[in-house]
């Protein structure tokens, strides 16, 4: 093979490699995912947490913002700071803005009962997370509070019930009274303890999801009941206060 022929072969091979490289570098399309991602571009998501400033909601927002940046949609957050009325106002304000998706994290089980259908009637997709209103939206992503409460109560029965050799004295530190966590969790507690009458509830008080308040309440309960067998809480953020209570 002459030098000129060799050059032509190498040039042709190089062209094929370059062409192949261009073809391979095209985004892979499985016929479904690309269309899904394309639909998200330019969409508006509105988020009303019960409050910002603690790990749970900050983590959710960080995840939303990261994905929004990657997929081309926007996330707007309005923080009611543990105030139910402020949450309702924020949600109504978002409905007027007509986002594509409204994400609600309900502090009060009843507060968004009108908000949810109102948003849906405007064509807004409503997603409720972790704590939902009585009225269902398009989707709920979160904890089954009845199941969790039931399992918690069963564990207390194992630790303090008739087969434990203990006295059965238990105290319950709940969150805010109108939250799904408390309302539904209490139903589960009652159902389990009804089947285990040896469990004696010596105190049930709300600490409003405040660790300092939980600490003070627990200290009082322990002083009044020094032989207490068990304490049942509803949220680890609040329970950090319970755990350091003084006797």
Residue ranges of model-derived segments:
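A residue-level marker of the well-folded mature domains of exported/periplasmic proteins
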Residues: 2-11, 21-247
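Short, linear, compositionally biased motifs with a strong N-terminal bias
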Residues: 13-16
């Amino acid at each position: 093979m002459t030098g000129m022929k060799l050059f032509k072969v190498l040039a042709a091979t190089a062209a094929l490699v370059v062409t192949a490289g261009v073809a391979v570098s095209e985004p892979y399309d499985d016929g479904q995912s690309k269309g899904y991602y394309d639909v998200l571009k330019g969409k508006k998501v509105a988020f009303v947490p019960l409050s910002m400033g603690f790990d749970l909601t900050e983590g959710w927002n960080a995840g939303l913002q990261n994905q929004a940046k990657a997929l081309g949609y926007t996330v707007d957050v309005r923080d009611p700071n543990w105030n139910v009325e402020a949450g309702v106002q924020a949600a109504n304000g978002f409905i007027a803005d007509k986002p594509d998706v409204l994400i609600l994290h309900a502090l009060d089980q009843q507060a968004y009962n009108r908000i949810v259908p109102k948003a849906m009637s405007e064509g807004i997709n409503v997603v409720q997370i972790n704590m939902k209103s009585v009225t269902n939206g398009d989707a709920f992503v979160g904890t089954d509070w009845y199941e969790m409460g039931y399992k918690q109560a069963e564990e207390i029965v194992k630790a303090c019930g008739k087969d434990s050799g203990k006295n059965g004295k238990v105290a319950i530190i709940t969150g805010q009274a109108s939250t799904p966590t408390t309302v539904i969790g209490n139903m589960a507690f009652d159902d389990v303890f009804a089947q285990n009458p040896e469990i004696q509830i010596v105190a049930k008080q709300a600490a409003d999801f405040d660790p300092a308040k939980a600490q003070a309440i627990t200290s009082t309960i322990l002083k009044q009941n020094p032989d207490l067998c068990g304490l049942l809480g509803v949220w680890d953020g609040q329970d950090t206060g319970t755990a350091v209570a003084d006797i």
